[in-house]
Amino acid sequence: MCGRPGDDGDMRSAVDVTVTGRVQGVSFRYYADREADRLGVAGWVRNEPDGTVAAHVEGDPGAVAAFVRWCHDGPRLAHVEQVDVRDGTDQGLRSFGVR
């Protein structure tokens, strides 16, 4: 996760995440949205046609890292097999949403 100063001068990082396993049909996106809100990160989460869940997350580097850690477990009904994380581009997003 690379960091850069945001508009307010605070360091920000951004990552793109792909979560593989039983992650659709188990409210993964709903709980990811709640976790993002709790952590104060911005971005989005969506289901992909191949059965994975994709997310773009940006904000405080520690909060982004905490979101990625949460993705390794996900909600109670999920069965996460793999979490791929790539450096993303900070888009200056200020909220998180389900797509």
From Swiss-Prot:
GO terms for molecular function: acylphosphatase activity. Keywords: Hydrolase. The active site is at R29, N47. It catalyses: an acyl phosphate + H2O = a carboxylate + phosphate + H(+). Residues 14-99 form the Acylphosphatase-like domain. Signal peptide: none annotated. The keyword Transcription regulation does not apply. Pfam families: Acylphosphatase (PF00708). Its EC number is 3.6.1.7. InterPro entries: Acylphosphatase, Acylphosphatase-like_dom, Acylphosphatase-like_dom_sf, Acylphosphatase_CS. Belongs to the acylphosphatase family. This is Acylphosphatase. The lineage of its organism: Bacteria, Bacillati, Actinomycetota, Actinomycetes, Propionibacteriales. The gene is acyP.
